[in-house]
Structures are given as C-alpha cells and as structure tokens.
Design a protein with these regions (language model features):
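C-terminal substrate-binding/catalytic lobe of Rossmann-fold NAD(P)-dependent dehydrogenases
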Residues: 1-95, 99
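C-terminal amphipathic alpha-helical interaction region
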Residues: 79, 84-150
C-alpha cells in the first residue's frame, strides 16, 4: 500500500495548499489561477508530475476545490487500502518513527469526512467535567451520565 500512502498524503497536502492559495485570492494583490498552479507544479519530479497531472484532470471535471473533490480523489485510489494506511501510521508511531504528515493528513481527512466531529469530542469533555446531559444519536434520548462510575 506504499503507493496509496504516498498518494493519500500528496492529495490531502495538495488540497490543503490549493485551498490556502484559493482563499488568498480574496485580497486584491493575489490573483492566482488554480489551473496555472497545476501547470507550474507539474514540471516537478516525474512522480510528482504524474500525481499532479491526474489530480489536475480531475479538477478540470469538478472546477471546484470542495470536499467532494478531495473525497473523489482519495476514494478512487485509496478506499480499499484505508485500513492499511491507518495501520502503517499506527505501526510507525508504535515503533518510535514519527509520521507527522501522514498523522496530520489522516486527522484532517477524518475531521472532514468522519461522522464524529471534533465538536462532539469537545462537548463530551465538557459533559465529563460539567455533568451536562448528552443526546443519544440513535434515539434522541437525553442521558445525564455520571462519568466516574462508567
């Protein structure tokens, strides 16, 4: 799954970078065209050029840097290997080999596409310390847990 790991990292990092560039266009002194950036970056190394060219083709179909674009990129190449990508990251960390880019990209991907958002985690921590009620997602029933007895 090494190729999928590299592609996953490349796609997530590229997507985040392109979004930063796109957002910078709100200021008058920046006026970047995403297609021009793809063209300039594709002149890099062969591997990078191949990845950028395939992502650039997909961008031409979408014409939008939205989450659907990122999801389609990763699903196409990595969906069947996602468990292995996570295991690779976990094994690296357990072995004392930091994988900061992969860890960060997995967290970014999960933040966007997971059913469990960071806000839920924060609320759970608030509930733990403040004993607030929580709502069960399955039946909308409110529960007032006493966390220290769980």
């Amino acid at each position: 799954p090494l190729e999928e790991i590299i592609f996953f990292n490349f796609a997530c990092s590229l997507y985040q970078g392109l979004n930063l560039i796109k957002k910078s266009n709100i200021w008058d002194f920046f006026d970047y065209n995403i297609e021009d950036i793809f063209q300039a970056w594709s002149a890099g190394c062969i591997l990078q050029g191949d990845y950028i060219n395939s992502i650039s083709q997909k961008y031409k179909n979408y014409k939008n840097l939205n989450f659907e674009f990122l999801h389609s990129l990763i699903e196409e190449k990595c969906s069947k290997k996602f468990k292995l990508i996570r295991e690779f990251n976990s094994n690296g960390i357990r072995s004392g080999l930091p994988c900061p880019v992969l860890s960060s990209n997995l967290a970014y991907y999960d933040l966007i596409f997971s059913n469990h958002k960071i806000g839920e985690t924060i609320q759970l921590q608030r509930s733990f310390f403040g004993l607030h009620t929580i709502k069960n997602k399955k039946d909308d029933k409110k529960i007032k847990p006493y966390w220290t007895k769980l």
